[in-house]
Amino acid sequence: MSLLLKMLLFSLFFFYMASISQCSDPTGGQFSFNGYLYTDGVADLNPDGLFKLITSKTQGGAGQVLYQFPLQFKNSPNGTVSSFSTTFVFAIVAVRKTIAGCGLSFNISPTKGLNSVPNIDHSNHSVSVGFHTAKSDKPDGEDVNLVGINIDSSKMDRNCSAGYYKDDGRLVNLDIASGKPIQVWIEYNNSTKQLDVTMHSIKISKPKIPLLSMRKDLSPYLHEYMYIGFTSVGSPTSSHYILGWSFNNKGAVSDINLSRLPKVPDEDQERSLSSKILAISLSISGVTLVIVLILGVMLFLKRKKFLEVIEDWEVQFGPHKFTYKDLFIATKGFKNSEVLGKGGFGKVFKGILPLSSIPIAVKKISHDSRQGMREFLAEIATIGRLRHPDLVRLLGYCRRKGELYLVYDFMPKGSLDKFLYNQPNQILDWSQRFNIIKDVASGLCYLHQQWVQVIIHRDIKPANILLDENMNAKLGDFGLAKLCDHGIDSQTSNVAGTFGYISPELSRTGKSSTSSDVFAFGVFMLEITCGRRPIGPRGSPSEMVLTDWVLDCWDSGDILQVVDEKLGHRYLAEQVTLVLKLGLLCSHPVAATRPSMSSVIQFLDGVATLPHNLLDLVNSRIINEGFDTLGVTTESMEASSNVSLVMTESFLSSGR
């Protein structure tokens, strides 16, 4: 059980066995740090008005400051809790943070007293808001700073990191044990039944956005009269102070005059003790010096392992660059147990970022030469700015020696090919497959036509299509992607992609284009519908190539023969037929015959219909003037479907 939870439980139940004292409140439920205060445990009041709740030198202790009289929170025992609010300024000075940590809590409790209760009743009628800090138990981890709400239970109902929200919604973290004064506002609204907690440095005004909110009626949990105050649990090296406090049980609280707050005392004695320990350590000679030298050499070798060479031109890509050390820790040293998958270009590892605990996927690839590295990283940085619901977000990269690491959002369901081929007990139904096709089409259309530049993916296949927890598809792995401006052809490069998805013109010229992506997408549509790979051994030679097999079955009048046997007859024949025919059109060997992705989406959505003589077009071996040769024009298509088919390029003079 964490210290914050222990502290909250302790503060909620330290009054457990006593009875409520129904004495009158001389302030009428409103006060600003007046003299009606009661202290208990390790707590005292300094002459300047500063309350110190923890002042232990040898072992951890507990202190309490509370308002001496019970305050009325209800008009009757069975009534509803009225609106109330409080604000206070506290400071925690920790000379040395420990894993055990320390903390402070504001409490509303039925009794006063600092008692230890071994058996906790879950109906103690108490409310507590706690602030806890502790040193991380990881070498490179961030210190813990938490705020939590506990209402009448042994578990925290709500908690979050300590800090405050700016007006633009950005969270600014606060170190609770920095020794600097921090102001807290706790407000309960009777109308909305909402409890808000806000905290901030006293150097700024109260933020408009609460840090922590919880909507819950407190009436069942509070008596008519309750005590309010603070409890503190600390380590031997921490001191907790309450500098100012204001409360109102009838609505909005009066602000504290910050100019009159007492100063937090310097912990010179504790710092002096630390300095003496350091001086003694430095005076040790001989064996200690040898040990230090050995440790220094070991540390140097460890740092050398994570050493990265950053060239001047990489500075512009800084926001997209991860350190190798972070990725090494995230993937547990790139262990095989963390491998999500692997292909011809490298392995993909699952990782957890050490600071944020965000799950990521890291693809490790080898870049064959330094030539073109700068241009490659420029494209990676550009793609990293893409934001689309059907694209896996590229978070950044890391470069170390001859290796590149691409960092993506983690997709919990993994890649599509696992569901198609490696998970016989989890079969994708037709509705899921059709939605996946539409998701990928939407993402690819965004890359080709809707962004400021044209992005050619160059490696569309099921292994690069990832699924989230709701089985929504996202196109990922931009390791081979190329960019070019709209209206300008991409440059010739090495042939990249996966066998079976590479278009004929790409293998001849080495020049990728949007139409080569459309070709791969067409093969993908056939693959997900038929449940088999583009090229593979089948019963007869005519079935070896997927596109040829589907076309032959269409020619013979039984195109539904190719549907994945695992689907049985649980599919919409009209949708399946559309996908198969559209897949053949997209994978046509003539680049100019293939539709653009915007047209593909129109066909899939039913906005446009395929031409009635599409089989002749797909079977055509000689195309002189595109659809006009077959008596099909964009005008005639527009007349029948109200949408014209947009082709990817001008027609070539050869066909399938």
UniProtKB/Swiss-Prot annotation:
Annotated membrane topology: Single-pass type I membrane protein
Spans within the Cytoplasmic topological domain: 298-656
GO MF annotations, alphabetized: ATP binding; carbohydrate binding; protein serine kinase activity; protein serine/threonine kinase activity
Entry-linked InterPro entries: ConA-like_dom_sf (IPR013320), Kinase-like_dom_sf (IPR011009), L-type_Lectin-RKs (IPR050528), Legume_lectin_dom (IPR001220), Prot_kinase_dom (IPR000719), Protein_kinase_ATP_BS (IPR017441), Ser-Thr/Tyr_kinase_cat_dom (IPR001245), Ser/Thr_kinase_AS (IPR008271)
The keyword Iron is assigned to this record: no
Record-listed E.C. numbers: 2.7.11.1
Gene Ontology terms describing biological process: defense response to other organism
Record-listed ATP binding positions: L340, G341, K342, G343, G344, F345, G346, K347, V348, K363
Carbohydrate attachment residues: N78, N124, N159, N190, N257
Catalytic reaction(s) noted: L-seryl-[protein] + ATP = O-phospho-L-seryl-[protein] + ADP + H(+); L-threonyl-[protein] + ATP = O-phospho-L-threonyl-[protein] + ADP + H(+)
Any Gene Ontology CC annotation: plasma membrane
Active site, renumbered: D459 (proton acceptor)
Subcellular location: Cell membrane
PROSITE patterns: PROTEIN_KINASE_ATP, PROTEIN_KINASE_DOM, PROTEIN_KINASE_ST
Location of the region described as Legume-lectin like in the Swiss-Prot/TrEMBL record: 29-248
Gene3D superfamilies: 2.60.120.200, Phosphorylase Kinase, domain 1 (3.30.200.20), Transferase(Phosphotransferase) domain 1 (1.10.510.10)
PANTHER family recorded: PTHR27007
Family: In the C-terminal section; belongs to the protein kinase superfamily. Ser/Thr protein kinase family.
Ranges facing Extracellular side: 24-276
The protein's name in its UniProt record: Putative L-type lectin-domain containing receptor kinase V.2
Species, as recorded: Arabidopsis thaliana (Mouse-ear cress)
Coarse class of the protein's main subcellular location: membrane
Ranges annotated as spanning the membrane: 277-297
Entry keywords, A to Z: ATP-binding, Cell membrane, Glycoprotein, Kinase, Lectin, Membrane, Nucleotide-binding, Receptor, Serine/threonine-protein kinase, Signal, Transferase, Transmembrane, Transmembrane helix
